[in-house]
């Protein structure tokens, strides 16, 4: 959460809050699906308690990137999102697991095995690293780095396959696997998955520690000389 206005109240609850009269078993099941994806069992619910109209609450991204709104009211079958892509949603949105039926996608795809399915009639907000690209497939096929897939419509068939021959896999520098998206529907792709961001920053982190140590060593050396 970035900020919220005075009339906004918040409460942490178990489950996704998709049903106002959801019983304990339903809440446990909903929370369990989030646990499998590595997310928290609880979600924070924000409510406008004011009587003078609309109030605002703003959400910040977990790392540099782009936040996109998607209207589930125009998507009767819902939206499939990678497990780290969901950021926030209107009350009434159901968050469930979407297992890929193809064994290869689950065994080798990493991001491809456990996906989240969002259904409802309100807006959801999806986060992507770097720049986001929306592609409209019309009975077409698209190959993408597995980590770059953010979301896609259920009409899209998702699978994971080896990226070319052995030489390409070892020396290509583009990863061992590619995701194949085939069918008709929209696909959202991110330019900078968080894993790539971490890999890009890792060398600088080491240099920063080394330079910091050198600077501290110089300071202590000067103090001792005195």
Predicted regions and their residues:
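Composition-driven recognition of glycine/serine/threonine/acidic- and proline-rich low-complexity segments
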Residues: 1-226
């Amino acid at each position: 959460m970035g900020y919220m206005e005075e009339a906004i109240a918040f409460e942490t609850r178990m489950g996704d809050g998709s049903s106002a009269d959801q019983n304990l078993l339903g809440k446990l099941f909903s929370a369990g699906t989030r646990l499998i994806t590595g997310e928290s069992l609880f979600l924070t619910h924000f409510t406008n308690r004011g009587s003078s109209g609309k109030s605002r609450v703003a959400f910040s991204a977990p790392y540099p990137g782009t936040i996109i709104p998607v209207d589930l009211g125009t998507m009767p079958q819902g939206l499939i999102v990678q497990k780290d892509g969901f950021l926030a949603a209107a009350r009434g949105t159901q968050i469930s697991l979407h297992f890929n039926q193809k064994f290869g996608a689950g065994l080798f795809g990493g991001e491809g095995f456990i996906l989240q399915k969002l259904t409802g009639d309100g807006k959801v907000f999806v986060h992507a690293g770097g720049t986001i690209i929306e592609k409209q497939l019309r009975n077409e096929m698209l190959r993408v780095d597995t980590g770059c897939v953010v979301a896609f419509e259920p009409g899209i068939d998702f699978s994971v396959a080896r990226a070319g021959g052995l030489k390409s896999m070892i020396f290509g520098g583009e990863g061992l696997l590619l995701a194949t998206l085939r069918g008709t529907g929209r696909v959202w792709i991110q330019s900078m998955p968080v894993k790539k961001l971490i890999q890009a920053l890792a060398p600088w982190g080491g240099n920063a520690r080394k330079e910091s140590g050198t600077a501290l060593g110089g300071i202590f050396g000067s103090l001792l000389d005195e």
